[in-house]
């Protein structure tokens, strides 16, 4: 196992260690979240964790959790989530995030917003000084509106194109049946709070991948002298 995967596994386990009996859990998407789901399933099977139920943020996560025997509920059936755990594509010093590399950010944001506590699990490569310098910002749009939205986003300084599928012809289609525009802002994103609102106010936009003022704790996998460890970053 390479060092990056070791870091992912370490933070996934550290997040699962915070789960208590009887919790309603938000189970995130992506490679690190998948490791977290697997670690949770092991603890449930051993009896170390009892009476928990998960709310998944993607169809992929739902399939994995179901196969591993984790009890699930739909998002619409819960009024509150005790703890949500998810990965991120970028994390800035103020705990603002870009998510949506897996095109699941709409459900991910709904789950994070409903959680009493939202933990983000990442390896150290995901920590950045400024968002969007290296990772594009995904914006989910109605299929009939993508051209109109694309033109409007140019006025906000964002240049973007449809995310295309790798193993089929045509664009990526989200779990909600929409399309993704991946945006780049020339100098990165200076004001995530403002930009999140501006983008979501554009007709035809369902949601964007900026997660603003949602994160309570970031668990970071780090390597020092070839030893993998986990650092907990919390808001002051």
UniProtKB/Swiss-Prot annotation:
It catalyses: aldehydo-D-ribose 5-phosphate = D-ribulose 5-phosphate. Its EC number is 5.3.1.6. Keywords: Isomerase. GO terms for cellular component: cytosol. GO terms for molecular function: ribose-5-phosphate isomerase activity. The active site is at 108 (proton acceptor). The keyword Isomerase applies. Pathway: Carbohydrate degradation; pentose phosphate pathway; D-ribose 5-phosphate from D-ribulose 5-phosphate (non-oxidative stage): step 1/1. Catalyzes the reversible conversion of ribose-5-phosphate to ribulose 5-phosphate. This is Ribose-5-phosphate isomerase A. It comes from Prochlorococcus marinus (strain NATL1A). The lineage of its organism: Bacteria, Bacillati, Cyanobacteriota, Cyanophyceae, Synechococcales.
């Amino acid at each position: 196992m390479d060092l990056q995967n070791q870091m992912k596994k370490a933070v996934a386990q550290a997040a699962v260690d915070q789960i208590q009996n009887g919790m309603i859990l938000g189970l995130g998407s992506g490679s690190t979240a998948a490791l977290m789901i697997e670690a949770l399933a092991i603890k449930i099977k051993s009896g170390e964790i009892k009476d928990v139920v998960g709310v998944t943020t993607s169809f992929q996560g739902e399939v994995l959790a179901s196969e591993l025997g984790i009890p699930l509920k739909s998002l619409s059936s819960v009024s509150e989530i005790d703890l949500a755990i998810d990965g991120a594509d970028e994390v800035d010093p103020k705990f603002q995030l870009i998510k949506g590399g897996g095109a699941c950010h709409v459900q991910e944001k709904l789950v994070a917003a409903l959680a009493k506590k939202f933990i983000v699990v990442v390896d150290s490569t995901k920590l950045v000084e400024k968002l969007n310098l290296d990772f594009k910002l995904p914006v989910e749009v109605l299929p009939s509106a993508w051209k109109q939205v694309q033109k409007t986003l140019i006025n906000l300084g964002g240049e973007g194109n449809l995310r295309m599928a790798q193993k089929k012809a045509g664009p990526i289609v989200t779990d909600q049946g929409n399309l993704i525009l991946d945006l780049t802002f020339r100098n990165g994103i200076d004001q995530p709070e403002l930009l999140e609102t501006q983008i979501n106010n554009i007709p035809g936009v369902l949601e964007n991948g900026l997660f603003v003022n949602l994160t309570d704790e970031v668990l970071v996998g780090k390597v020092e002298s070839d030893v993998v460890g986990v650092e907990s970053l919390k808001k002051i």
